[in-house]
Amino acid sequence: MSGSIDQLSHLDAAGRARMVDVGNKAVTAREAIARGRVVMQPATLQLIVSGGMPKGDVLAVARVAGIMAAKRTAELIPLCHLLNLSHASVNFTPDPAGNALEIEATVRCTGQTGVEMEALTAVSIAALTIYDMCKAVDKTMQIDGIRLIAKRGGRSGDWQREESA
């Protein structure tokens, strides 16, 4: 990890937390994609996929929870800016070989700051919702690998994580 305290934009010269002033930044299209996964017992994954979980449709509830979380990120993360999102989606891919449910969130806006935190928050809350809805049948679940996959737009430009297959 490289960098110095001078590069931490959420700290002032005295090291105190502050909200970054983005007022002079250009308004540009922004997009971020984040992923994570919930590892579980094979029977739990099957119950989720088949819609047989006692608490209801896990994927539908987790999708809505993730989208709501993206919209409310500024209320959850203290120094995040309130953004006018133009798009937020949360999708799931079962991974039977890994006994996991993969989560991917995509968030977009046109604004003066990026939407990385909104995408990461969407994945995190979707994962926690899955955990909450399934904990009665599987206490071994594990939330894993929440990470930013890509970001587009803004002064720092585009970025893509290189992931091995």
From Swiss-Prot:
Entry EC no(s): 4.6.1.17
Active-site residue list: D132
Gene Ontology BP annotations: Mo-molybdopterin cofactor biosynthetic process
Keyword Lyase (UniProt): yes
UniProt-listed SUPFAM superfamilies: Molybdenum cofactor biosynthesis protein C, MoaC
Cited InterPro entries: MoaC, MoaC_bact/euk, MoaC_sf, MoCo_biosynth_MoaA/MoaC, Mopterin_CF_biosynth-C_dom
Catalytic activity, reaction form: (8S)-3',8-cyclo-7,8-dihydroguanosine 5'-triphosphate = cyclic pyranopterin phosphate + diphosphate
Binding-site list for substrate: L79, C80, H81, M117, E118
HAMAP family membership: MoaC_B
Subunit structure: Homohexamer; trimer of dimers.
Protein name listed in UniProt: Cyclic pyranopterin monophosphate synthase
Lineage, uppermost ranks: Bacteria, Bacillati, Chloroflexota, Chloroflexia, Chloroflexales
Gene transcribed to yield this protein: moaC
